[in-house]
Regions:
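Basic, amphipathic alpha-helical/coil surface patches used to engage anionic, phosphate-bearing ligands
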Residues: 1-347
Length: 347
């Protein structure tokens, strides 16, 4: 099993979200009226996930249906996106060597879908070399790397998942393996802590309601100390979405239920999934992997390399994308990924 969500253009179709309660419906009507009166237009890229209705509902839900607060939040996000040219992130230059070097210090990848159809982001947090990566990229570069990933989720993975399920899929499922977490490399390191604060603030202010759940695996004693600091950056609603799993069989059972089967759980978490190229490659604290990047990482990199002025067909397979991009050999393995047919596994 490997991530097979098709690549989509930010303008590609999605499934519009809808109000879930009469209160939301009433607030949505008032929100639209307020935006019209103030001549606020929601950018098309912000509507990629759930349509314009979905975009508006996320801001309403984040502000507990307070139209005035939701309007202020939305206006701030639109201004922030314009000032920082966020729409161009997926088309801005992506250096191949830098991408591979960063992946070596930050083992993470997308990993199919969970049982609810949400795209899964998987990260071996305990093995990440945060201090080295922040030093290498700087605060701005580290944040930009995160934002590029958020835009990919928001404008590509979530719309694709929605179309696949024919219903709104507007949130992500994160699985983080915090085994061997180093306090020095995270909350005890001033620059890393500063970077984590910046990411938490941006996510809260400009990507509301993007997170469905974060499953925390293999939590060591150091995680308690780290979490006591990190949670201070998060609002109570986001904190509640972090679920620390038990150990051993208890953890495996929880992952199996959440991800939709033991064959969807990576071997390093006790499961039976064997992704072509690995579920998460390049773990610097463990054995080296045969390949540099997972299939999902290669797909992500190729998407960012693509000429975004031309639309990317919904049903492109990795081979088609590789051909269109000059067969980028991101793994240095003669394009093994390009030979794989892009067939989505059943959830």
């Amino acid at each position: 099993m490997f991530d097979t969500l098709p690549m989509r253009d930010p303008e590609a179709r999605t499934v519009d979200d809808v109000p879930s309660t009469p209160e939301e419906e009433t607030a949505l009507a008032s929100f639209r009226a307020a935006l019209k009166e103030e001549n606020v237009v929601v950018p098309r890229t912000m509507c990629a996930n759930g349509g314009e209705t979905g975009a508006l509902l996320r801001y309403l839900r984040a502000r507990k249906l307070d139209v005035t607060k939701a309007t202020s939040m939305l206006r701030a996000t639109i201004a922030w996106r314009e000032e920082n040219d966020i729409d161009a992130l997926l088309s801005s230059p992506l250096d191949e060597d830098e991408f591979r070097a960063n992946a070596a210090m930050y083992p993470a990848s997308y990993h199919g879908e969970d049982a609810a159809g949400r795209p899964v982001y998987m990260e071996r947090t305990g093995s990440a070399q945060f201090a080295a990566l922040v030093t290498k990229l700087g605060q701005e570069g580290f944040l930009k790397m995160h934002l590029r990933g958020m835009e990919y989720q928001y404008r590509v993975l979530l719309p694709s998942a929605s179309v696949k399920r024919n219903k709104p899929i507007t949130q992500m499922c994160n699985v983080i393996d915090v085994g061997e977490l180093s306090l020095y490399d995270t909350v005890s390191h001033g620059e890393v802590l500063r970077a984590l604060k910046a990411i938490a603030a941006v996510d809260a202010d400009h990507y509301p309601e993007n997170l469905g759940i974060t499953l925390v695996c293999n939590a060591p004693w150091s995680f308690t100390s780290a979490w006591s600091v990190v949670r201070l950056f998060l609002d109570t609603k986001t904190q509640a979405k972090f679920k620390v799993l038990g150990k051993g069989k208890e953890q495996l059972k929880a992952l199996e239920e959440a991800l939709g089967g033991i064959d969807k759980v990576p071997a390093f978490l006790g499961g039976e999934c064997v992704c072509p190229g690995g579920c998460v490659c390049l773990d610097p604290k463990h054995e080296p992997t045969e390949r540099v990047l997972t299939d999902a990482q290669v797909r992500y990199a190729r998407f960012c390399f693509a000429n975004r002025e031309s639309r990317v067909p919904e049903d492109d397979v990795p081979g088609d994308v590789a051909e269109g991009l000059g067969a980028l050999d991101l793994n240095g393995d003669a394009g093994d990924v390009a030979a794989e047919k892009d067939e989505a596994p059943e959830p």
